[in-house]
Amino acid sequence: MAHKRGKKYQDAAKQVEADKVYGMGDAIDLVKKIDFAKFDATVEVAFKLNVDTKQADQQLRGALVLPNGTGKETTVIVFAKGDQAKAAEAAGADVVGEQDLVERIQDGWLDFDVAIATPDMMAQVGRLGRVLGPKGLMPNPKTGTVTMNVEKAVSDAKNGQVTYRTDRDGNVAVPFGKVSFDADKLAGNLKSIAETIVRIRPAAVRGTYVQHVSISSTFGPSVDVDLASLLA
């Protein structure tokens, strides 16, 4: 049985012209206008990419720091010892630990947004794969969260870093701010994401790489966006 959308959603959707592809500025203005959440909703961009995710070299994954931040307070934990632990604390990590932190998570604590680890801690952190992996919290070199440069990793996480990853169908969804952001700040973040996605196009891709782009707020309808307007 198909899920029926609520009246607020339907009213919002009526304000989006069917089959119209909007320029970036108009799309952002419309998403802000039609948002009906009673909280400061997140705004997200979704890309449909022409990639074969069965091929390892076409599975995109990484991270970037948004120029205007995410509008979210990020809780960061770091698995490190010695000088690296001190550096993580100095950089503003919320929790720093070794085996004690591993055990705390094994006992069920998951009140954090980003986990960072130094390479020498990964043998211990690896035991948390079944817990952190499904939640997208497992430290990974591709997202800069397995590193000896913990200061930079903590700073990036605290200052607007977002991660991206293709799903099995070649879709990539990335948050780029809050509805309360000025349109210019949302535009700056959105352009940064689009430029990154285009830049990391796998060499093996043939034909149109970015097939579709849309943006939406947490509960709002999606608005199709012209890719060229994001790269201008």
From Swiss-Prot:
Signal peptide boundaries: none
Domain of life: Bacteria
One GO biological process term: translation
GO MF annotation: an example: tRNA binding
Pfam families named among the record's database cross-references: Ribosomal_L1
GO cellular component: large ribosomal subunit
UniProt xrefs under InterPro entries: Ribosom_uL1_bac-type, Ribosomal_uL1, Ribosomal_uL1-like, Ribosomal_uL1/biogenesis, Ribosomal_uL1_3-a/b-sand, Ribosomal_uL1_CS
Keywords on record: Repressor, Ribonucleoprotein, Ribosomal protein, RNA-binding, rRNA-binding, Translation regulation, tRNA-binding
Entries under CDD domains matching the protein: Ribosomal_L1 (cd00403)
Protein's job: Binds directly to 23S rRNA. The L1 stalk is quite mobile in the ribosome, and is involved in E site tRNA release.
NCBIfam families: rplA_bact (TIGR01169)
Family: Belongs to the universal ribosomal protein uL1 family.
Subunit structure: Part of the 50S ribosomal subunit.
Protein name in the entry: Large ribosomal subunit protein uL1
